[in-house]
C-alpha cells in the first residue's frame, strides 16, 4: 500500500543520509591527520 511505500522510501533516504554523513566524517578525519 501507499504507507508501506512511504516507509520504504523513508528507510532508503535514512540509509543514504547515514552513508553520506559517514563519508563526510571520514573525509574530515583524514584531512585532520
UniProtKB/Swiss-Prot annotation:
The modification Leucine amide is found at residue 33. It comes from the Eukaryota. Its main location: secreted. One of its GO terms (cellular component) is extracellular region. Expressed by the skin glands. InterPro entries: Dermaseptin_dom. It is found in: Secreted. Keywords: Amidation, Amphibian defense peptide, Antimicrobial, Secreted. GO terms for biological process: defense response. It holds the Pfam family DD_K. Belongs to the frog skin active peptide (FSAP) family. Dermaseptin subfamily. Has antimicrobial activity. This is Dermaseptin-H6.
Amino acid at each position: 500500500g501507499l504507507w508501506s511505500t512511504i516507509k520504504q522510501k523513508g528507510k532508503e533516504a535514512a540509509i543514504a543520509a547515514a552513508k553520506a554523513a559517514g563519508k563526510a566524517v571520514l573525509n574530515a578525519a583524514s584531512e585532520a591527520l
